[in-house]
C-alpha cells in the first residue's frame, strides 16, 4: 500500500512539474523591481539570518546618520555570474556556452580551424564534466579571440541575444531565464537603494 501511494504521489509530482515554466526575462526583471528600496522579498525566508544581515547592511550604508554611511556615488555591488546569479552547470558556465555558440552556431562568425579545434577541446571537457585547471586560461584566451573587434555595446547585445537561445538539454528554458530568483531580488533591492551593480 505504501509503495502504491508513493508511486501515485511521484507520478502526480512529475505531472505537475512537467507543466512548470521558467520565468521570462521580463518577469525576472519585475521580480527584482518589486522588492523596492524597503525590501519586500518573496523568495527569501522572512526573518532568516542572511536576509536580516543584508537588510541591516543596506540600512547602515544608506542612512546618512550611520557611521557606516556610504554616499550613493560610492555604492557598488559586484556579482559573480555563474553559480551566484545563474546556474553554472547547465551544462557549463554561461560564457563558455556562449563561446561555443559563437564558434559553432553563429552564421555571422567564421571560426578558424584553430578556434574550432579549441572549441572541440573545451566542449569535450564540458560534457565529460572534467575541466582541467588550465582550461580556464585556455577558454579565456579563446573568448578574447572570437569576440575580438566587438565594442562593449556589441558584446552586450550579443550576450542579450544569446540569452534568448534555449539551454541545451532543458525544456522550455532559455539562457536568460536561468536566473536564481532570490538573487534577482537582491540585485533589485541593491539597485533600488542606490547601488551600481555589475
Residue ranges of each PLM-predicted region?
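Gram-negative bacterial Sec-dependent N-terminal signal peptides
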Residues: 2-21
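Alpha-helical substrate-recognition element adjacent to the catalytic core
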Residues: 23-77, 81-198
Amino acid at each position: 500500500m505504501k509503495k502504491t501511494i508513493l508511486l501515485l504521489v511521484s507520478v502526480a509530482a512529475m505531472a505537475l512539474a512537467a507543466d512548470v515554466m521558467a520565468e521570462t526575462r521580463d518577469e525576472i526583471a519585475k521580480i527584482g523591481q518589486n522588492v523596492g528600496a524597503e525590501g519586500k522579498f518573496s523568495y527569501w525566508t522572512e526573518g532568516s539570518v542572511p536576509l536580516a544581515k543584508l537588510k541591516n547592511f543596506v540600512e547602515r550604508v544608506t542612512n546618512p546618520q550611520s557611521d557606516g554611511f556610504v554616499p550613493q556615488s560610492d555604492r557598488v555591488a559586484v556579482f559573480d555570474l555563474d553559480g551566484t546569479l545563474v546556474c553554472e552547470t547547465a551544462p557549463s558556465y554561461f560564457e563558455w556556452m556562449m563561446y561555443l555558440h559563437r564558434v559553432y552556431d553563429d552564421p555571422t562568425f567564421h571560426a578558424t580551424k584553430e578556434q574550432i579545434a579549441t572549441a572541440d577541446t573545451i566542449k569535450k571537457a564540458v560534457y565529460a564534466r572534467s575541466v582541467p585547471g588550465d582550461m580556464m586560461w585556455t577558454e579565456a584566451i579563446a573568448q578574447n579571440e572570437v569576440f575580438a573587434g566587438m565594442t562593449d555595446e556589441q558584446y552586450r547585445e550579443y550576450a542579450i541575444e544569446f540569452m534568448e537561445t534555449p539551454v541545451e538539454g532543458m525544456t522550455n528554458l532559455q539562457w536568460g531565464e536561468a536566473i536564481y530568483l532570490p538573487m534577482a531580488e537582491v540585485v533589485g533591492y541593491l539597485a533600488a537603494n542606490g547601488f551600481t551593480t555589475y
